[in-house]
C-alpha cells in the first residue's frame, strides 16, 4: 500500500506531518505494510492536507484530512467521508496545463529515479548533445520570458551572457519570493527541486557558466532543506560536478540564504547580498549580464523561468510556444490568495481572462460577498475592478490597462475592503522596504503616506499632489520597488474614486 502525504510548507502548517505519522502508526497497529511518500502539494490548498492512496485505478484523493480521518483509509476507500475521487479527475487538475509543475505532487521530490521516469533529465541530455549557441536559440525560439515580474525574453539575456568574454560566468536563480500571494517558487523547490537543478545546469551549458547559486529567503527553511538535499543527490549521481552526466562539461551549484529583505528580490540588490554586501540596488548600466556576480557576466533568472527550460529542451521550442497567445507564450503558474474560495496554484497557458481566473477557477470570494477588486502582481501590482475582468492574462494586455502580471500572484478582495486604505498600505510598504539608495523611492514613499493620510482625514485636494508624486516615483526610481508602487496607488484612485470621496464625507 502506497500513500502520499504532502511535505509542502502550507500542508505542514495545516497538519500534514501529524497525518503522516498517524498513518504510519495505524499501519503498524494493523500489521499492514505501508509506504508513506512525502510528496509536493497538488496546489489545492483549501483541501490540505490532501492525502492520496495509490489504487489500481489511479491515485485517490482525500481531504482536507486530519488525524481522526486516518483509520478509515484502511477500510472501504470509496466510503471514506473525505473521499474526493481520482486526483487527476478533479476539476482543478483537469483544467490545468501542467508543464513546469508536471511532476509536483506526483513524485517523491528527492527520488532521482522517479524524476527520470517522468521525463526528468531528458532536456539536459538533449542540451549536452548541442552546441551552446543552439541551446540559446532553442530557448529564444520558445518565446520564454522572465516569470519573476519583468517579462524580459529569457533567450536575449542568455545570448548576452553567452557572447560575453570572461574567465568565469555565473547562473543565479532568484528564489527570493517576497511578493504577497506568491508561493510558486517555494512549491517547486519543495515539490520538484531536480527540475530547477536541471534548468540551471542547462543554462550553465548554454552560456558557459560553471557555477550556479540559488538565492532564497530565510523564511523558506523547508525549501532550503529540500534544495540542499537535492543538490547533494544530483552531485552524487553525476548530474552536477566536474563532468555533468559524464560529458566532461562542468557545472555545480549551491544554495545561499538571504535575510528576508523585500528589495533583495531585485536582481542587483540580490547580487550585492550574494556577495556579502548590503542589499541595495545598483545603478544600470552595467547590466548583470555583463557585470553581475563578482563583476562577471551573470544570468539572473527566476525559479519558474529556469524550471521551464527542461520541458523546452525535452519537447522543443515549437511545442512550448504552441501554448499562450501573442507574445505571452507557454504557461504561467497562477497563485490565488486573499479572500478566495479556492486558493492555490493553477498552471495554465496565457490567455484566460481575469474573470475566468477569479470566478471560475477561484470560485469567487471565501466570504461569499461580491468581488470588489483583484490585485495582480504582488504588493506592487495594480488593483483591477470587475469592469476589467475581461482582460486576457497576458503581459501586453495587462500593460495596456496600466497593470502588470509580475509573479502571477492574485489577491482577491471583497466589497468590504477600503481601497484608500489599500493605497496607503502600498506606500507604507514601500517606505518600510526601501533600500534608501534613490530619493524618489526613499523620500517619495514617506511623502506618499503623508499625502494619503491627508486624504484619509478628509482633504481630497491632496490627490493632485499624490498623482505628481507617483509620476516622479515611477519615472525616477532606480528599481521596480519605487517605480511600481504607483501601480496599486493610482489604480485605486482611478477605479475606486468613491472610496476616496467617502473619507471627505466622513470627515465632514
Question: What annotation goes with each model-predicted range?
Answer:
Residues 14-37, 55-77, 122-141, 167-178, ...:
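Ferredoxin-type iron-sulfur electron-transfer modules in oxidoreductases and energy-metabolism complexes
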Residues 224-350, 362:
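Hydrophobic alpha-helical positions that pack around
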Residues 78-108, 286, 293-305, 313, ...:
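Intrinsic disorder at enzyme termini
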Residues 107, 112-122, 173-185, 288-293, ...:
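Gly-rich Lys/Arg/Thr-decorated short loops/hinges at beta-loop-alpha junctions or inter-strand turns
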Residues 27, 199-201, 349-366:
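Short amphipathic, charge-patterned alpha-helical segments
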Residues 192-206:
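Histidine-anchored nucleotide/phosphate-binding helix
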Residues 125-165, 321-322, 327, 335, ...:
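Accessory "access/gating" subregions that flank catalytic or transport cores
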Residues 11-12, 46, 120, 139-161, ...:
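Conserved phosphate/anionic-ligand binding catalytic regions in large, soluble enzymes, centered on
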Amino acid at each position: 500500500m502506497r500513500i502520499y502525504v504532502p511535505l509542502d510548507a502550507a500542508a505542514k502548517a495545516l497538519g500534514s506531518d501529524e497525518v503522516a505519522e498517524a498513518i504510519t502508526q495505524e499501519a503498524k497497529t494493523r500489521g499492514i505494510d505501508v509506504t508513506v511518500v512525502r510528496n509536493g502539494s497538488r496546489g489545492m490548498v483549501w483541501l490540505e492536507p490532501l492525502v492520496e492512496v495509490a489504487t489500481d485505478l489511479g491515485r485517490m484523493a482525500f481531504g482536507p484530512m486530519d488525524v481522526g480521518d486516518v483509520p478509515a483509509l484502511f477500510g472501504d476507500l470509496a466510503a471514506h467521508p473525505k473521499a474526493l475521487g481520482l486526483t487527476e479527475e478533479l476539476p482543478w487538475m483537469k483544467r490545468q496545463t501542467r508543464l513546469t509543475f508536471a511532476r509536483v505532487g506526483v513524485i517523491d521530490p528527492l527520488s532521482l529515479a522517479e524524476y527520470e521516469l517522468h521525463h526528468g533529465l531528458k532536456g539536459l541530455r538533449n542540451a549536452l548533445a548541442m552546441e551552446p549557441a543552439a541551446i540559446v536559440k532553442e530557448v529564444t525560439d520558445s518565446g520564454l520570458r522572465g516569470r519573476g515580474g519583468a517579462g524580459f525574453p529569457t533567450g536575449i539575456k542568455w545570448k548576452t551572457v553567452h557572447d560575453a568574454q570572461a574567465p568565469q560566468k555565473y547562473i543565479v536563480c532568484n528564489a527570493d519570493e517576497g511578493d504577497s500571494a506568491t508561493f510558486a517558487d517555494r512549491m517547486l523547490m519543495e515539490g520538484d527541486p531536480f527540475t530547477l537543478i536541471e534548468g540551471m545546469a542547462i543554462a550553465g551549458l548554454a552560456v558557459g557558466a560553471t557555477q550556479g547559486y540559488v538565492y532564497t529567503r530565510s523564511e523558506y527553511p523547508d525549501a532550503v532543506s529540500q534544495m540542499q538535499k537535492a543538490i547533494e543527490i544530483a552531485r552524487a549521481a553525476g548530474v552536477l560536478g566536474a563532468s555533468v552526466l559524464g560529458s566532461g562539461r562542468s557545472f555545480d551549484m549551491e544554495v545561499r540564504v538571504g535575510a528576508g529583505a523585500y528589495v533583495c528580490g531585485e536582481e542587483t540588490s540580490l547580487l550585492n547580498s550574494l556577495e556579502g554586501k548590503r542589499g541595495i540596488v545598483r545603478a544600470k548600466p552595467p547590466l548583470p549580464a555583463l557585470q553581475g556576480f563578482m563583476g562577471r557576466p551573470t544570468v539572473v533568472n527566476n525559479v519558474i523561468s529556469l524550471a521551464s527550460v527542461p520541458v523546452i529542451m525535452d519537447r522543443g521550442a515549437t511545442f512550448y510556444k504552441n501554448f499562450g497567445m501573442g507574445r505571452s507564450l507557454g504557461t504561467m503558474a497562477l497563485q490565488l490568495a486573499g479572500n478566495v474560495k479556492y486558493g492555490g496554484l493553477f498552471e495554465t497557458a496565457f490567455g484566460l481572462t481575469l474573470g475566468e481566473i477569479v470566478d471560475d477557477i477561484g470560485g469567487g470570494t471565501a466570504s461569499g460577498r461580491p468581488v470588489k477588486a483583484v490585485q495582480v502582481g504582488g504588493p506592487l501590482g495594480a488593483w483591477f475592478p470587475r469592469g476589467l475582468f475581461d482582460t486576457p492574462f497576458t503581459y501586453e494586455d495587462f500593460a495596456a490597462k496600466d497593470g502588470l502580471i509580475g509573479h502571477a500572484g492574485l489577491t482577491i478582495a471583497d466589497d468590504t475592503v477600503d481601497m484608500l486604505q489599500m493605497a496607503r498600505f502600498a506606500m507604507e510598504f514601500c517606505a518600510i522596504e526601501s533600500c534608501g539608495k534613490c530619493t524618489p523611492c526613499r523620500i517619495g514613499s514617506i511623502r506618499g503616506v503623508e499625502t494619503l493620510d491627508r486624504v484619509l482625514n478628509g482633504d481630497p485636494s491632496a490627490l493632485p499632489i499624490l498623482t505628481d508624486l507617483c509620476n516622479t516615483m515611477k519615472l525616477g526610481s532606480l528599481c521596480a520597488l519605487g517605480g511600481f508602487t504607483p501601480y496599486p496607488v493610482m489604480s485605486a484612485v482611478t477605479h475606486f474614486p468613491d472610496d476616496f470621496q467617502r473619507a471627505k464625507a466622513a470627515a465632514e
